[in-house]
């Protein structure tokens, strides 16, 4: 039998020289010493041992979720060009003996792997024709309920000057087409590894040079440990609302790249000690709240909602500032001081939720009538002006507006939906009681508890689908958020206008998370995002400038926090239908 790793050249001394240069000699020796008559799984195990390679599985428990039958598509990044296919196939065959691997034609030339590997030609000028048979075989295998491992980039990763890192080439829409057609379950896997600097330098000269050097990158891995991070199964229903094949492919790439981010992303927690109000002051706090009866907006079971000016709050404003810091620090934000207060507090109203049973501040908003603040303190008197650059033309464009910000729900009350609902009923009362105002605006944060990948995804999706374009020339962030590694296309961004789908992908980036609650709430009110700012003094939280013109909010939504009577009055004042 002809050794498939040897060059069929004459004279033989030239072939031997080239085999040594390109690393084929080592591979040839390994092949000559192979055990005969073994199945693909045993052959792969032999090759891995002979190469001196080991591997580590992270989140190995996710492999147990692989369905034993039915169409399954495994996707992975392609940093090495050969070794990852061998190691992954060896692991995956334990769970799906019916596995097929879509790989380059060079690996398929090995007789022992013909049953396992489906080859595609990445070198020939007539690749599209020669690849047809391989792609057809993959379609047939998935149609019959088989499992397929595919590297959607199609080629080994390259050094990208723009991002200053080695990363996959754009993923091909083929995987999206396969999922859409066969409703496959998908398993994302991230491979951590890289080839030599010479390899990437050669690729920058010409892609064919990179391909020629692939055998050496396989043969020089003695002692190399390959880390594989196994993602969670993605059921076809999860991406049912994503219709475009390229958008589906991008969704899978983000899910795969996120597996690398999971081990790299660490939220920055504050370390200073917070000094709470002494317990013996609770009764004094209760007394001061009772003195605010004229500012009470809502009574509901154990909660009351108040909106009062700073100079009437005394101990209450101190407790609000402490609760702010506790809440923000709990999600990786915060000022780092014992309480979160600033020079803006004194000329804003403070809307707060009071737990009259446990004598605690359950949540709060800072509220300011824009025209009043600007007439007294100028544009710089608005808190948002400390985060975004704008002038009077922005204020004029807003119209009759109320600035809202510094909102929080204390951690003890975050699992109770009534907390946010009551605060928003309070906001509804403010709007109805001040009929000249119709627009709410202010900053809403995405904390450092979210990974860089998730934060960039949120920024791109929201600015693509929910941008306040009429304000684009009037406001800009003081410190813009920079997306370091954009791996998605415009097609995916437009498909993720569905907030539910966006939330699921964020959960892939950061397990257990979704789009922040307040952002979801504002978008449900037909809110738009003007821009995002990085708040360096607030532990680098990401601050989106949200603008909500309540005149275009769905009537059903407005009724929920204004009440039927208040909503009717609001509609009449602003001459709205609905």
Language-model-detected regions and their locations in the chain:
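Acyl-donor binding region in acyl/amide transferases
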Residues: 325, 335-338, 370-528, 533-543, ...
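A short helix-loop-beta-strand connector motif used in the catalytic cores of GNAT acetyltransferases and
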Residues: 343-352, 514, 539-544
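Conserved N-terminal entry element of GNAT/NAT acetyltransferase domains
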Residues: 271-311
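Membrane-anchoring hydrophobic helices of lipid-metabolizing enzymes
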Residues: 1-78, 85-87, 94-98, 114
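Non-catalytic C-terminal accessory region of glycerolipid acyltransferases
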Residues: 132-277, 488-496
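Short amphipathic alpha-helix that is part of the acyltransferase structural core
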Residues: 297-350, 354, 360-363
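Conserved nucleotide-cofactor-binding alpha/beta core module
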Residues: 93, 98-131, 136-138, 142
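Carboxylate/His-rich catalytic cores and anion/metal-binding grooves
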Residues: 96-103, 348, 354-380
């Amino acid at each position: 039998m002809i050794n498939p790793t040897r060059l069929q050249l004459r004279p033989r001394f030239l072939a031997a020289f080239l085999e040594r240069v390109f690393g084929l000699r080592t591979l040839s020796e390994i092949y000559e010493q192979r055990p005969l008559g073994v199945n693909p799984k045993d052959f792969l195990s032999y090759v891995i041992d002979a190469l001196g390679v080991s591997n580590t599985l992270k989140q190995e428990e996710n492999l147990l979720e692989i369905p034993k039958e039915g169409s399954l598509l495994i996707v992975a990044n392609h940093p090495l060009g050969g070794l990852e296919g061998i190691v992954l196939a060896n692991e995956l065959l334990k769970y799906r003996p019916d596995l097929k691997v879509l790989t380059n034609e060079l690996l398929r030339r090995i007789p022992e792997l013909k049953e396992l590997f489906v080859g595609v030609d990445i070198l020939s000028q007539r690749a599209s024709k020669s690849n047809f048979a391989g792609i057809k075989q993959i379609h047939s295998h998935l149609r019959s309920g088989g499992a397929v491992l595919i590297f959607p980039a199609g080629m080994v990763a390259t050094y990208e000057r723009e991002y200053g890192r080695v990363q996959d080439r754009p993923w091909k829409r083929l995987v999206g087409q396969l999922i859409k057609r066969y409703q496959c379950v998908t398993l994302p896997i991230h491979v951590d590894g890289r080839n030599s600097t010479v390899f990437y330098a050669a690729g920058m000269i010409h892609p064919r040079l990179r391909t020629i050097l692939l055998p050496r990158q396989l043969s020089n891995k003695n002692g190399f440990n390959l880390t594989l991070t196994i993602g969670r199964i993605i059921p076809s229903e999860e991406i049912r609302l994503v219709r475009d094949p390229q958008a589906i492919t991008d969704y899978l790439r983000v899910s795969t790249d996120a597996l690398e981010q999971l081990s790299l992303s660490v939220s920055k927690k504050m370390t200073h000690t917070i000094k709470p109000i002494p317990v013996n002051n609770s009764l004094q706090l209760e007394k001061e709240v009772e003195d605010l009866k004229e500012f009470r907006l809502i009574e509901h079971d154990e909660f009351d909602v108040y909106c009062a000016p700073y100079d009437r709050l005394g101990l209450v404003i101190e407790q609000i500032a402490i609760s702010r810091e506790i809440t923000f620090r709990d999600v990786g934000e915060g000022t780092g001081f014992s309480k979160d207060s600033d020079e803006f507090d004194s000329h804003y109203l403070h809307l707060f939720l009071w737990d009259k049973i446990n004598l605690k501040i359950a949540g709060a908003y800072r509220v300011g009538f824009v025209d009043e603040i600007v007439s007294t303190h100028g544009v710089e008197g608005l808190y948002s002006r400390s985060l975004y650059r704008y002038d009077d033309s922005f204020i004029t464009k807003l119209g009759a507006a109320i600035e809202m910000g510094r909102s929080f729900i204390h951690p003890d009350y975050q699992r109770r939906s009534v907390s946010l609902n009551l605060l928003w009923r309070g906001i509804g009362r403010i709007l109805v009681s001040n009929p000249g105002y119709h627009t709410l605006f202010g900053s809403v944060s995405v904390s450092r508890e979210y990974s860089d990948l998730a934060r960039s995804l949120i920024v791109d999706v929201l600015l693509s689908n929910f941008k306040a374009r009429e304000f684009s020339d009037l406001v800009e962030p003081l410190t813009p958020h920079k997306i370091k590694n954009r791996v998605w296309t415009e097609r995916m961004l437009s498909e993720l206008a569905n907030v539910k789908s966006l939330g699921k992908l964020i959960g892939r980036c950061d397990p257990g998370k979704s789009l922040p609650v307040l952002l979801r709430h504002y978008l449900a009110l037909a809110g738009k995002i003007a821009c995002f700012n990085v708040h360096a003094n607030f532990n680098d939280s990401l601050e989106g400038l949200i603008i909500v013109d309540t005149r275009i909010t769905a009537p059903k939504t407005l009724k929920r926090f204004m009440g039927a009577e208040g909503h009717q009055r609001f509609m009449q004042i602003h001459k709205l239908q609905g």
